[in-house]
UniProtKB/Swiss-Prot annotation:
Stored Gene3D superfamilies: 2-enoyl-CoA Hydratase, Chain A, domain 1
EC number: 3.4.21.92
PROSITE patterns listed in its UniProt record: CLP_PROTEASE_HIS (PS00382), CLP_PROTEASE_SER (PS00381)
Assembly and interaction partners: Fourteen ClpP subunits assemble into 2 heptameric rings which stack back to back to give a disk-like structure with a central cavity, resembling the structure of eukaryotic proteasomes.
Name of the encoding gene: clpP2
Reactions accelerated catalytically: Hydrolysis of proteins to small peptides in the presence of ATP and magnesium. alpha-casein is the usual test substrate. In the absence of ATP, only oligopeptides shorter than five residues are hydrolyzed (such as succinyl-Leu-Tyr-|-NHMec, and Leu-Tyr-Leu-|-Tyr-Trp, in which cleavage of the -Tyr-|-Leu- and -Tyr-|-Trp bonds also occurs)
Location of the active site: 98 (nucleophile), 123
Protein name: ATP-dependent Clp protease proteolytic subunit 2
Enzyme class, spelled out: hydrolase
A molecular-function term among this protein's GO annotations: serine-type endopeptidase activity
UniProt-annotated location(s): Cytoplasm
Length: 203
């Protein structure tokens, strides 16, 4: 069971307690800090849509510390990020692996960040296949389709050729923060919040 901290704020009409994620949402900050599952994706999407309705032009910040997760869940978040009309700042803290790396790269170009000791990783999709021989054939074909689809998305986000993405993703392909800049996964390494404020102050 995950413990969620609560914070207490003085509202002028008394004190009000709220969970830390709700408090961060007030500052247009969304946290992806676990495996990317369907329930998590629905929560993140709801937060993003709420922030869009609050102010369709003001930047949103997404902090990512995730080992990856389900492809469909990750793509749902990715499509929502692209659906928003505002700039999205992404930050890797700790790790952004697999679908986490894709979401990191999906931020607005020029506003994709990593902290100095972050690690990023891309690889090809995988999954257990069970059922009849016909079922196995269909599922294997779907995995190959998703592999090409994800490679196309990463190519668009990073500027790397699709062929290179596919080749690099054959095995777990790890990158440090500076390597991720060279790869096109992020745009800059930040060491303090002051540096991140420069990205959002003009919007």
């Amino acid at each position: 069971m995950t413990l969620v901290p609560y914070v207490v704020e003085d509202t002028g009409r008394g004190e009000r307690a709220m969970d830390i994620y709700s408090r961060l949402l007030k500052d247009r900050i969304v946290m992806i800090g676990q495996e990317i599952t369907e329930p998590l994706a629905n929560t993140v999407i709801a937060q993003l849509l709420f922030l869009m309705s609050e102010d369709p032009k003001k930047d949103i910040q997404i902090f990512i510390n995730s080992p990856g997760g389900y492809i469909t869940a990750g793509l749902a978040i990715y499509d929502t990020i692209r659906f928003l009309g505002c700039d999205v700042n992404t930050y890797c803290i700790g790790q952004a692996a697999s679908m986490g790396a894709l979401l990191l790269s999906a931020g607005t170009k020029g506003k994709r960040h990593a902290l100095p000791h972050s690690r990023m990783m891309i690889h090809q999709p995988s999954g257990g296949i069970i059922g009849t021989s016909a079922d196995i054939q269909l599922q294997a074909a779907e995995i190959l389709t998703l592999k090409k689809h994800l490679a196309n998305i990463l190519s668009e986000c990073t500027g790397q050729p699709v062929e290179k993405i596919i080749e690099d993703s054959e095995r777990d392909f790890f990158m440090g923060a500076e390597e991720a800049i060279s790869y096109g996964l992020i745009d800059k390494v930040v060491t303090s919040a002051k540096e991140t404020n420069k990205d959002t102050s003009s919007t």
